[in-house]
Structures are given as structure tokens and as C-alpha cells.
């Protein structure tokens, strides 16, 4: 006879690392060229003027300036666009 009780298996016990997604520079903030503005999966926020888009859909500033957000109307859903107004 066994002197130890057999332990059952479990299907839990896994968790992924957080990806730190979200807005990194809010409206009205001053940013420098190359600054990350938004980390996202997919294009929930579209790039506007002076904003580039990386291969992982990260939005970043192309010039120094001030961050602005605007809502744009698309056929099926409203979207947001982020732009950088160049500092003069």
C-alpha cells in the first residue's frame, strides 16, 4: 500500500507577462522626435500628422511638438487619430 497520497494534476498555473500597452504620451504633452506615443495591438488609434507607425502598430513621434488627439468618423465605427503639432 502507498504511504503517500497520490497528488492530482492541475490545468492551471500559467500566466503571461504583461505587455505594457496603452497611451504613453497624452494630449497636450510635449514630445521629442522618436518618442513612443501609444503601444497597441492593432490600429485602435490611427497615426496622424508627424506620427509614424511601427511594425507592431506602435505609434511614435516623427518631430518635436505637442500631442493632439482627434475623433474621426468612419463608416462603421468612430476612430481616434493622434498627431504631433510641430513646435515652432
UniProtKB/Swiss-Prot annotation:
Ribonucleoprotein among keywords: yes
Matches recorded under SUPFAM superfamilies: Ribosomal L27 protein-like (SSF110324)
Record carries keyword Ribosomal protein: yes
InterPro entries: Ribosomal_bL27, Ribosomal_bL27_CS
Key words, A-Z: Ribonucleoprotein, Ribosomal protein
A GO biological process held by the record: translation
GO molecular function: structural constituent of ribosome
Stretch forming the signal peptide: none
Matching Gene3D superfamilies: 2.40.50.100
Record region (Disordered): 1-24
GO cellular component, as recorded: cytosolic large ribosomal subunit
UniProt cross-references to HAMAP family, sorted A to Z: Ribosomal_bL27 (MF_00539)
PANTHER family associated with the record: LARGE RIBOSOMAL SUBUNIT PROTEIN BL27M (PTHR15893:SF0), RIBOSOMAL PROTEIN L27 (PTHR15893)
Alphabetized NCBIfam families for the sequence: L27 (TIGR00062)
Similarity comment: family membership: Belongs to the bacterial ribosomal protein bL27 family.
Protein name from the UniProt record: Large ribosomal subunit protein bL27
Source species of the chain: Prochlorococcus marinus (strain MIT 9303)
Gene that produces this protein: rpmA
